Amino acid sequence: MHPIQVPRRLLLRRQFLQVSGLSGISLLLGGCGLPLFESVVGKLSEPLNQKVEALLFNPQKLAPEFPPSAIEPEALLVNTFDFTPQINPATFRLKINGEVNNPISLSMVEIQQMPLSSMIIRHVCVEGWAAIVQWGGVQLRELLQLAQPKDTVRYAYFQSADGYYDSWDLASAAHPQTLMAYQKNGQPLSVDNGAPIRLASPIKLGYKQSKWVTEITLTSKLLPKKGYWEDQGYEWYAGL
């Protein structure tokens, strides 16, 4: 198994905002993607982000984590895109395909046999609220490595059982704190929170953290349909 090679030109946007002095704006507004924030930095498109990334992005830099005493059990609100799908964990398969040498389809039993990663992080919603949550699952990069991505891969697309879709840059998908989670606060993930498996990461806003993920497709290009909310005007990168 070979480690995923993350291209240097994929930008973690938060560091560009920090050095440019714009990060405080997002904090004052409760999250990126709000209208005023978009009017200020929304034009800083992905091509510009990628050009400056080589100077700024450390793909291994970790976001803050918290002690168990900081967990806020009731603070994570449940937002639904359309409906809550009912998925049988016994028959569920997570597919990873696209520009890979070894397309795979994994059961939850197979996923749960992989090393468990756990983190207590801040989940931040574009609506302006946040929650300290413990997530448990498998590092996404470990799953992607099983599919043997080709050297051309730059993006990961996520398809969910409810029809929701989104895409991430490969650097963020391969970040050590990006999980495919099947536990929340030490308990099996509930259906409302995305069971049997969902994205969880402290480096992206909440709408990037797809629930009920059924398929991950790796590509070399960012496709016209970038994400459900992004296609309606939300920021694509949505980094923290």
Enumerate the language-model features and the residues they cover.
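N-terminal secretory signal peptides
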Residues: 1-11, 15, 22-30
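Low-complexity, intrinsically disordered/propeptide-like segments
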Residues: 13-14, 19-20, 30-32, 47, ...
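Structured, non-membrane catalytic/scaffold regions adjacent to prosthetic-group chemistry
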Residues: 35-240
